[in-house]
């Protein structure tokens, strides 16, 4: 659980930048990539990640502009990436102007359970990270280069003068 807005905002800045890098790497064609016809496509997961910022925080008193629905899925990768950038920035501005550290202790109902806003913010980051992991697998299957997040991606080791780990 986050105890201060500053701590959350520093974490969000890194995580949002990482998510933005992934979304910026998508192509319109890659949005159709799927594991099976019974699972979400890369585009569906990407758009859900955008909309989740507003959906997850909808039971709080925060007000900001963000997509409120994660379906239907846009067909433009650029639109998805731009929408994430806008939603994330609006979310950060709302936090800075509408909440205080004290607000993080206030409890809300989220998916049938009571939790402090600080825990909800942790859930938001973890939820986003979960879907980023799914996206990286689908991106590889779609033939895209995956940017490194918590370390270099396979294609990035050479930038550091190192050989990529053996397969």
From Swiss-Prot:
InterPro entries: DinB (IPR007837), DinB/YfiT-like (IPR034660). A divalent metal cation binds at residues 48, 127, 131. One of its GO terms (molecular function) is metal ion binding. Keywords: Metal-binding. It comes from the Bacteria. It holds the Pfam family DinB. Belongs to the DinB family. This is Uncharacterized protein YrdA. It comes from Bacillus subtilis (strain 168). The gene is yrdA.
């Amino acid at each position: 659980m986050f105890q201060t807005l500053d701590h959350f905002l520093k974490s969000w800045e890194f995580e949002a930048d990482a998510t933005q890098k992934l979304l910026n790497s998508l192509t319109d064609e890659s949005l159709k990539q799927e594991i099976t016809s019974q699972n979400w496509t890369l585009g569906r997961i990407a758009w859900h990640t955008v909309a989740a910022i507003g959906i997850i925080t909808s039971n709080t008193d925060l007000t900001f502009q963000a997509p409120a629905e994660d379906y239907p899925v846009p067909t433009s990768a650029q639109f998805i990436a731009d929408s994430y950038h806008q939603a994330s920035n609006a979310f950060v501005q709302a936090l800075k102007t509408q909440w205080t550290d004290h607000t993080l202790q206030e409890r809300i109902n989220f998916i049938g359970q009571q939790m402090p806003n600080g825990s909800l913010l942790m859930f938001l980051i973890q939820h986003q990270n979960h879907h980023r992991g799914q996206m990286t697998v689908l991106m590889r299957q779609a033939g895209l280069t995956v940017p490194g997040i918590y370390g270099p991606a396979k294609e990035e080791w050479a930038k550091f003068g190192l050989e990529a780990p053996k397969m």
